[in-house]
C-alpha cells in the first residue's frame, strides 16, 4: 500500500497515522515480536490502542530487509527502505521473501476467484527497482501509470499504539482532479475529540504487482478511462487461508468482490462496506469535508461497484470530522454545509457539484437508518425541493426531508445533476405531493371553513348536504378562547341504524380545539401535537387524519349552497325557522315578573334591577336560539354552566322599551331580555335580562328569531 490514512473510524483510537515522508519509501512495521525493539510501532489483531498516530522508528536490521512477525495474528507486512542505500545481500533476501509472499497471496486469491490473473514473482517486479532520484522524477513525470483505488480495511478489535511523532506526509492526496480515482482519501488533520470508535479505514494505493508505490503529491491529473473495481481488504481479525498469517487478500476482480458476502465467515466477521452512491449516507457525511476537490470531475462509473452495509456505514461515519475527499463525481453528493456532530468546528463551505437534489438529514447523522417524515407547520415538504431520488441498493434512498425543530441537522442540502430523477417513493404522509394542500392554499380558503360567529346548529345546517370530510371551525360557545370543529363523517355502515326522517345531523361530529400558550390542540387526543395556528392544524389534518375520524377536505367554495354565513332572517320568517342564531351577551339577572309578559315584563325587570343598591356583576354567556328553544352557556362558569329554556316555555323576547343601557364593568350597552315560564312556580313568569357584549354580535338576530318561532303555530 502506498498510504496508510488517518481515520476517525477506528475503534478506541483517534486516527491511524502514517510515517512521515522524510524518506520517500517508508511503511509500517508488522505486528510486534520479542525480536523487535520496544519502541517499534505495530498493528495487532486485538484492537486499536488509545493513540492512533504511528511514527516510524529506525530499523535495527539491514535497510532493505523485511522484518517478519512471528505471531500468527500479524496480518500486515511492510517494507522499510532507507533513501540512497541498497545492500545487495539484503536485496536478495527481500526479493526471495517477496516472491514467497506473492506465491502465498496468489494461492489465496485463486481459492476465492479462479479467474484471477496471477501476479508473476521475480526480481523484475517494482520492488526490485532502485530508489534513485531519477526514478522518482520519472514517476512524477508519468502519473498516468498510476491506477489509484480505494481500499477498505475493517477491524473491530484493532489497536494502534503510540508513536513519538505524528504523521505529516504531504503525499496523502492523490493527483488532483484525476478521473481515474475511485476511492476516498481521509485527512489526518483530525482533532482527537472528533474520532469515532467504528471499524472502517480507507486509504488509497496504486495498482501494482507486488509493492505499492506512493502517489507523488505533485503528480499531474491523468486522463485515462475509469479505473477497475475497488480493492477490499477484510478485517484484521479475520481468519486467513494462507501461510504466514496473510489474511488480507487483494480483490481485483468483480466476481471476487461480489463473493465477499458469501465468503464472509472465512474472510471477515464484520466487513465495513461503504457506499459512494449519491443517495447514501456516506456522501452526506463526506460532503462536510474541509476541502472539496475540483467540481468538474468526470463521472463514468456507477455507484453499484461499492458494497453497502447499513449496519456499518452509519456507525462508522457518524462522528466524522473535517476530512479530505476525493471521489468520483457520479458517486458523490456534496452538501454545501453540514455539521455532522456536536462539538466539532463547522466545516468550510464547499462549492456544490450541481444544483438539484432533495434536502434531507442523512440517516448516519441522525443515528437512524430511515428518515422519519415529519410534516412542517404547513404539512408539506420544503418548497423547491424535488421528489426523492432512488438508486439501486438496499440503502440508497432519500426522502424529501421536512425540516423541523426536532431534527438536529442544521443544513444538509445536497446537489446532484448526474442522476436522473426517479418517481417519488411512497411515504406515510398520505397522498402525493401535488395532491397535498399547501399552507398558502389553506389560508386562502379560510373564509370558507372558518366561521367564528355561527352557532352549532348553523354549522350542522351548512354541513348537512356536504361530502364526508367537510368541516367548519367556529368559536366555542362553551369554552372561551377555544374553537369548535364540526366535521361530516362517513356514512353509517348499516342503513338500519338510521331512523325514519333522519336529516343526517348525527353524521356531523363536534370536536373541541383547545388554545393555550403551546398552541392549538385537539382536546382528548394526547397523541396529537400542538400546532401554531388553526391553519396549521387544518393543513396537517387534511394530510393525515391523526385522531379525527377522517381527513379534512379543504373547501374551495361556500358550504351549504353558497351563503352559509348569511343572516338567518334575510329571507323572512321561513328562512328563520330553518336556521339558528346565537351571540355572546352579558347576563345580568333574572327577575320574577309574576304574570306579566311581553314588553311590560322586560321594562319592569330592568327597572327593578337598576334600582338595586348593589348592581349585579355581569357574566359573559353564549346566547343561542334554535328550534328547540334558548340555551344559555356560562363561558366563565361563574353563575351556572348551562341552562336550557324550551320553546314551549317562552313568552316574549325583546329590547328595553325605554332604550336604557348597561354601563357597569363595560361600555354602554343596550339591554334586552326574554320572558319564560318559571321552572318552580307554574303561575309565574321570570324575565332574564342581558346586555349586548359585542357590537359585531348584536342581539337583534336572536330577538327576531325568537319572535318568528313564537309566531309559528305549529311549534307552539
UniProtKB/Swiss-Prot annotation:
Polar residues: bias regions: 197-206, 265-274, 402-419
InterPro entries, A to Z = PH-like_dom_sf, PTB, PTB/PI_dom, SH2, SH2_dom_sf, Tensin_PTB, Tensin_PTEN_phosphatase
Instruction: Relate the assembly described in the record.
Output: Interacts (via SH2 domain) with Rho GTPase-activating protein DLC1 (via C-terminus); the interaction is independent of DLC1 tyrosine phosphorylation. Interacts with integrin ITGB1; the interaction displaces tensin TNS3 from the ITGB1 cytoplasmic tail and promotes ITGB1 stability. Interacts (via SH2 domain) with E3 ubiquitin-protein ligase CBL (phosphorylated on 'Tyr-782'); the interaction is enhanced in the presence of EGF and reduces interaction of CBL with EGFR.
Start-end of Pro residues biased regions: 214-228
User: What does the entry list under GO cellular component?
Assistant: cytoskeleton; cytosol; focal adhesion
Segments for region (Disordered): 119-274, 301-322, 334-366, 379-436
**Pfam families, alphabetically?**
PTB, SH2
- Entry's family note: Belongs to the PTEN phosphatase protein family.
Renumbered to this chain, the signal peptide range is 1-17
Compositionally biased spans, kind Basic and acidic residues: 138-150
Domain SH2, residue spans: 449-556
Q: Where is the PTB domain?
A: 583-704
Q: What does the UniProt function comment say about this protein? A: Promotes EGF-induced cell migration by displacing tensin TNS3 from the cytoplasmic tail of integrin ITGB1 which results in dissociation of TNS3 from focal adhesions, disassembly of actin stress fibers and initiation of cell migration. Suppresses ligand-induced degradation of EGFR by reducing EGFR ubiquitination in the presence of EGF. Increases MET protein stability by inhibiting MET endocytosis and subsequent lysosomal degradation which leads to increased cell survival, proliferation and migration.
| Superkingdom of the organism of origin | Eukaryota
Report a single Gene Ontology molecular function. actin binding
Q: Does the keyword Phosphoprotein apply?
A: yes
Q: Which organism is it from?
A: Bos taurus
Any single GO BP term: protein localization
Q: What is this protein called?
A: Tensin-4
Amino acid at each position: 500500500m502506498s498510504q496508510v490514512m488517518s481515520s476517525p473510524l477506528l475503534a478506541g483510537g483517534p486516527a491511524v497515522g502514517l510515517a512521515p515522508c522524510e524518506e520517500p519509501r517508508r511503511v509500517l512495521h508488522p505486528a510486534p515480536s520479542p525480536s523487535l525493539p520496544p519502541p517499534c510501532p505495530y498493528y495487532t489483531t486485538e484492537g486499536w490502542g488509545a493513540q492512533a498516530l504511528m511514527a516510524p522508528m529506525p530499523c535495527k536490521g539491514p535497510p532493505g530487509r523485511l522484518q517478519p512477525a512471528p505471531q500468527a495474528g500479524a496480518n500486515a507486512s511492510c517494507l522499510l527502505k532507507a533513501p540512497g542505500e541498497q545492500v545487495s545481500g539484503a536485496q536478495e533476501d527481500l526479493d526471495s521473501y517477496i516472491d514467497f509472499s506473492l506465491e502465498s497471496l496468489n494461492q489465496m486469491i485463486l481459492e476465492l476467484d479462479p479467474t484471477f490473473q496471477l501476479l508473476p514473482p521475480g526480481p523484475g517486479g517494482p520492488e526490485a527497482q532502485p530508489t534513485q532520484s531519477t526514478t522518482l522524477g520519472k514517476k512524477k513525470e508519468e502519473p498516468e501509470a498510476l491506477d489509484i483505488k480505494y481500499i477498505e480495511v475493517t477491524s473491530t478489535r484493532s489497536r494502534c499504539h503510540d508513536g513519538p511523532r505524528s504523521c505529516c506526509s504531504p503525499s496523502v492526496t492523490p493527483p488532483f482532479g484525476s478521473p481515474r480515482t475511485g476511492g476516498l482519501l481521509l485527512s489526518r488533520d483530525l482533532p482527537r475529540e472528533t474520532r469515532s470508535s467504528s471499524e472502517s479505514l480507507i486509504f488509497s494505493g496504486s495498482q501494482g504487482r507486488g509493492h505499492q508505490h506512493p502517489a507523488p503529491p505533485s503528480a499531474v491529473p491523468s486522463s485515462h478511462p475509469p479505473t477497475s473495481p475497488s480493492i477490499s481488504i477484510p478485517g484484521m481479525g479475520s481468519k486467513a487461508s494462507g501461510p504466514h498469517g496473510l489474511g488480507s487478500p487483494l480483490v481485483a476482480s468483480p466476481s471476487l468482490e461480489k463473493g465477499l458476502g458469501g465468503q464472509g465467515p472465512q474472510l471477515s466477521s464484520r466487513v465495513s462496506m461503504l457506499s459512494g452512491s449519491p443517495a447514501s449516507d456516506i456522501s452526506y457525511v463526506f460532503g462536510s469535508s474541509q476541502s472539496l476537490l475540483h467540481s468538474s470531475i468526470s463521472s463514468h462509473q456507477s455507484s453499484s461497484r461499492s458494497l453497502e452495509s447499513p449496519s456499518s456505514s452509519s456507525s462508522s461515519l457518524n462522528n466524522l470530522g473535517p476530512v479530505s475527499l476525493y471521489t468520483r463525481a457520479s458517486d458523490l453528493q456534496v452538501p454545501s454545509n453540514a455539521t455532522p456532530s456536536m462539538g466539532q468546528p463547522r466545516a468550510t463551505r464547499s462549492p456544490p457539484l450541481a444544483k438539484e437534489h432533495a434536502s434531507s438529514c442523512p440517516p448516519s447523522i441522525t443515528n437512524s437508518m430511515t428518515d422519519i417524515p415529519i410534516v412542517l407547520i404547513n404539512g408539506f415538504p420544503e418548497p423547491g425541493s424535488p421528489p426523492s431520488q432512488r438508486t439501486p441498493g438496499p440503502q440508497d434512498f432519500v426522502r424529501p426531508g421536512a425540516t423541523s425543530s426536532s431534527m438536529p441537522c442544521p443544513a444538509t442540502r445536497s446537489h446532484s445533476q448526474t442522476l436522473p430523477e426517479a418517481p417519488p417513493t411512497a411515504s406515510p404522509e398520505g397522498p402525493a405531493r401535488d395532491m397535498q394542500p399547501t399552507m398558502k392554499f389553506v389560508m386562502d380558503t379560510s373564509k370558507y371553513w372558518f366561521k367564528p360567529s355561527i352557532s352549532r346548529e348553523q354549522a350542522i345546517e351548512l354541513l348537512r348536504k356536504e361530502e364526508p370530510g367537510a368541516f367548519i371551525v367556529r368559536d366555542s360557545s362553551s369554552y372561551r378562547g377555544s374553537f369548535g370543529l364540526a366535521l361530516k363523517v362517513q356514512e353509517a355502515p348499516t342503513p338500519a341504524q338510521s331512523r325514519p326522517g333522519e336529516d343526517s345531523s348525527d353524521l356531523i361530529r363536534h370536536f373541541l380545539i383547545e388554545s393555550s400558550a403551546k398552541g392549538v390542540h385537539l382536546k382528548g387526543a394526547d397523541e396529537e401535537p400542538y400546532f401554531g395556528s388553526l391553519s396549521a392544524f387544518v393543513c396537517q389534518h387534511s394530510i393525515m387524519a391523526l385522531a379525527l375520524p377522517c381527513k379534512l377536505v379543504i373547501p374551495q367554495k361556500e358550504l351549504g349552497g353558497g351563503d352559509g354565513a348569511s343572516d338567518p332572517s334575510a329571507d323572512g320568517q321561513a328562512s328563520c325557522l330553518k336556521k339558528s342564531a346565537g351571540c355572546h351577551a352579558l347576563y345580568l339577572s333574572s327577575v320574577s315578573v309574576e304574570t306579566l309578559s311581553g314588553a311590560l315584563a322586560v321594562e319592569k325587570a330592568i327597572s327593578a334591577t337598576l334600582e338595586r343598591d348593589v348592581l349585579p356583576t355581569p357574566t359573559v354567556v353564549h346566547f343561542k336560539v334554535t328550534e328547540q328553544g334558548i340555551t344559555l352557556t356560562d363561558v366563565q362558569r361563574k353563575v351556572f354552566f348551562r341552562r336550557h329554556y324550551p320553546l314551549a316555555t317562552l313568552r316574549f323576547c325583546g329590547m328595553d322599551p325605554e332604550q336604557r343601557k348597561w354601563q357597569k364593568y363595560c361600555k354602554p350597552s343596550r339591554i334586552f331580555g326574554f320572558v319564560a315560564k318559571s321552572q318552580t312556580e307554574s303561575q309565574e313568569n321570570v324575565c332574564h335580562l342581558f346586555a349586548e357584549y359585542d357590537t359585531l354580535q348584536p342581539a337583534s338576530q336572536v330577538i327576531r328569531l325568537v319572535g318568528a318561532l313564537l309566531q309559528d303555530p305549529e311549534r307552539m
